[in-house]
Amino acid sequence: MAMAMSDSGASRLRRQLESGGFEARLYVKQLSQQSDGDRDLQEHRQRIQALAEETAQNLKRNVYQNYRQFIETAREISYLESEMYQLSHLLTEQKSSLESIPLTLLPAAAAAGAAAASGGEEGGGGAGGRDQLRGQTGFFPSPGGASRDGSGPGEEGKQRTLTTLLEKVEGCRHLLETPGQYLVYNGDLVEYEADHMAQLQRVHGFLMNDCLLVATWLPQRRGMYRYNALYPLDGLAVVNVKDNPPMKDMFKLLMFPESRIFQAENAKIKREWLEVLEETKRALSEKRRREQEEAAAPRGPPQVTPKASNPFEDEDDDEPTVPEIEEEKVDLSMEWIQELPEDLDVCIAQRDFEGAVDLLDKLNHYLEDKPSPPPVKELRARVDERVRQLTEVLVFELSPDRSLRGGPKATRRAVSQLIRLGQCTKACELFLRNRAAAVHTAIRQLRIEGATLLYIHKLCHVFFTSLLETAREFETDFAGTDSGCYSAFVVWARSAMGMFVDAFSKQVFDSKESLSTAAECVRVAKEHCQQLGDIGLDLTFIVHALLVKDIQGALHSYKEIIIEATKHRNSEEMWRRMNLMTPEALGKLKEEMKSCGVSNFEQYTGDDCWVNLSYTVVAFTKQTMGFLEEALKLYFPELHMVLLESLVEIILVAVQHVDYSLRCEQDPEKKAFIRQNASFLYETVLPVVEKRFEEGVGKPAKQLQDLRNASRLIRVNPESTTSVV
C-alpha cells in the first residue's frame, strides 16, 4: 500500500515538473509553507533526486538505443553534403556556359534547334515547345558559327527544319524554294481585332531568320495548323501594347498597309517575342549590310608574283606551303580530350584533387610540343576555367576557416596539388597562414591556472612542438622548390615567435613575477628553442631580441627593490654582531654563504653561534649574490651594460653606507667592528662578485675593478670626510 502511494506521488511530482506553466520559485514557496518540518523537506528532496536519477538513466538509455541511428544520420548528412557540393559545381558550370553564349549569334541558330522545336511541338506545342527551344544551348551556334557538336547548319539540317514545318502547317510548300531558311522561335498566340479588341482566332507564329509565318489553328486536327500569312522581316515593325486589363500581354505587328494584334500566354512569353523579333530583325539587317559591302568592294586582278631571277634560288622555293598547314593541325578527337572538361568538373565536385591535376598534367604533356591553332586555344580556355575553380577549392581547403585539428599534415594534400599546378608561392603563403592560425588557436586555448612556471612549460611545449612539426612538414612539401619559399618560412617563424613572446611576456613579466621565476621561465624557453637546431633553424637570437626590453625592465625593477631594502636596513643599522642562537642556524648560514661563493666565512664566525659581521652586511651579501646568479641566467650580450650598471648601483649603496659610518662613528669598538665589516665587503664580497660575473659573462668587468680599487682609498685615509661616490 505504501509502495503504491509512493509511486503515485512520484508520478504526480513528475507531471507537475513537466507541466508547461511550472515555476520553480512558486513551487519552492508553496512547498515551504505546506511542509511540517525539516523531515518533510528532506523526503521531498530525496524524491526529486530519485526522479532526476531516473530521468538521467532514461536519457542515457534513449541515447544508447538511438546511437546507431545517430551515426547513420551523420553519414547520410555527409553524403548529402558531398552531393550538394557536386551539384553546386555542376550548376555553376551550367550557368557559366549559358552566360557565355553571345546573344548576337541568336539568328545564326543551328539545325539542331529546329529539331528541338519540332520535338517540342509534337509534345503538345504551345509554351512547352517554346521553352524547349529557348532552353537548349544546342539551339544557338558557337562563336565559330558551328553547333555544339562541331557541325554547322548544313543543307540536311535546313531541309529537316522545313520538313518539320510542312508536316505541321498546311499550304506552306513554297517555303522549300527559299534556301538557307531556318526556324528561330515559335509559339501559340491569340489574335484580336484591332478596332474593338474582340478575340478573332488562335494562331501559331513561326519566326524564321528572314520572315514571320502566321498559321491558324485547326480544331479538328490536334497539333496541326493552316497557312495564313507570311511577312518578310524587312517591312515588319513590332510595337508593344500597354496593358489595359483585362487586355494585357499584347503586342502589335505593323505591315504596311495593315496591322495585327496578338496576345501572348503571359508577360514572360510576350517579352520573349519582343526580344527575339528585334534581335532577329537586327541580325538580318546586319547580314544584308555585310553582303552589300562585300558586293560593293572593288576586286582587283590577282597579283602574280614574278618569278625570281636569282640563280642561287632553289627550285624548292616554288613548292606549296601545304606541310606548314598540316603542322598546324592537332588531333583533339580522342575521347579523353573531348571529355576532359567534364571529367575535371567531376573530379572537383568529388574532391578528387589528385585526379584533376593528373588529367591536367596529361593534357599539358600531350600539347607540350604542339602548335596552338584556334581549337587548341579554345580547349585551353575551357580547361583554364576549371583550373581556376580547382585553385579556388584548394585555397578554401587551406583557409584558416577550415578545421585546424589535423595538424600540418592535414594541409599536405592541398599544398602538393597547388605546387603541381605551378602555384608554389600561393601554396607557401596559404600553408604558412594556415599554420599561423593553428598556432594562435593553440596558444589561446591554453588555460592559465596554477603556477606561472607550469603554464610556461605548457606554452613552450605547445608552441615549439607546433613550430617543429610545421618546419618538418614545410621541408617535406616544398623540397626542391624555389628557395624564396624558405625565406618566407623564416619570416613566418619570426612572426610566430613574436606571437609566442607576447603570450610569454604577458604571463611572466606583466604579472610582476620574481626574478628567479622569470629566469627559470626564460631558461625553459631557451631549451625548447635549442631543439629547433635539429632541423637547422636557430631562433635563439630572435627570442633574445624580443625579450630584451622585458628583461631590462625586470632587472631594473629588481635592482630598485634591492636598493630600497638595503637603504631600509642601513637606516636601522646598530653595528652589532649577529647572534644566531643555535648551531643549526649557524650551519645554515655557513651553507648559504658557501653557495654564494664566500669560502672563507669561517674566519668571521666566533664562539657560541656568534658571527663577527653585521646583519646588514650579511643580508646584503646574500641578496646581491642571489641577484647576480638569477641575472646571469637571463644574460645575453645585449644585457651586458644593463646588468653591470645595476650591480655597480647596488654595491655603491653598501659601500657608501660603510664609508659614511666609518667616518661618523666615534666609539672605538664600533669603529673597529665597522672596519671588520668593510674588510669583509671589500676583500671578500667584491672579489667574489667580480669573479662570478667574469665566469658568467666570459670577460672581466672594468667597472667592478675600478670600484674595488677605489675602495682602497678609504683604507689609506680613513680619517677623510670625503665619501666615495
From Swiss-Prot:
Compartments in which it is found: Cytoplasm; Cytoplasm, Perinuclear region; Cell projection, Growth cone; Cell projection
Q: Give the multimer and partner information.
A: The exocyst complex is composed of EXOC1, EXOC2, EXOC3, EXOC4, EXOC5, EXOC6, EXOC7 and EXOC8. Interacts (via PH domain) with GTP-bound RALA and RALB. Interacts with SH3BP1; required for the localization of both SH3BP1 and the exocyst to the leading edge of migrating cells.
> So which domain of life are we looking at?
Eukaryota
Main location class? cytoplasm
What is the protein's name according to its record?
Exocyst complex component 8
The question of whether ATP-binding is a record keyword is answered with no
Q: Which InterPro entries match?
A: Cullin_repeat-like_dom_sf, Exo84, Exo84_C, Exo84_C_1, Exo84_C_2, PH-like_dom_sf, PH_domain
Q: Name one Pfam family in it.
A: Exo84_C
GO annotation terms (biological process):
endosome organization; exocytosis; extracellular matrix disassembly; Golgi to plasma membrane transport; protein localization; protein transport
Query: What role does it play?
Result: Component of the exocyst complex involved in the docking of exocytic vesicles with fusion sites on the plasma membrane.
Query: Which keywords annotate this record?
Result: Cell projection, Cytoplasm, Exocytosis, Phosphoprotein, Protein transport, Transport
Per the UniProt record, the source organism is Bos taurus (Bovine)
| Residue(s) carrying Phosphoserine | S19
GO terms under cellular component: exocyst; growth cone; late endosome; perinuclear region of cytoplasm
Q: According to its UniProt record, which protein family does this protein belong to?
A: Belongs to the EXO84 family.
What gene, per UniProt, encodes this protein? EXOC8
Q: Which residue intervals make up region (Disordered)?
A: 116-159, 285-322
**GO molecular function, a single term:** small GTPase binding
Q: Where is the PH domain?
A: 182-282
From start to end residue, where is composition biased (Gly residues)? 120-129
Q: Locate the compositionally biased regions of type Acidic residues.
A: 312-322
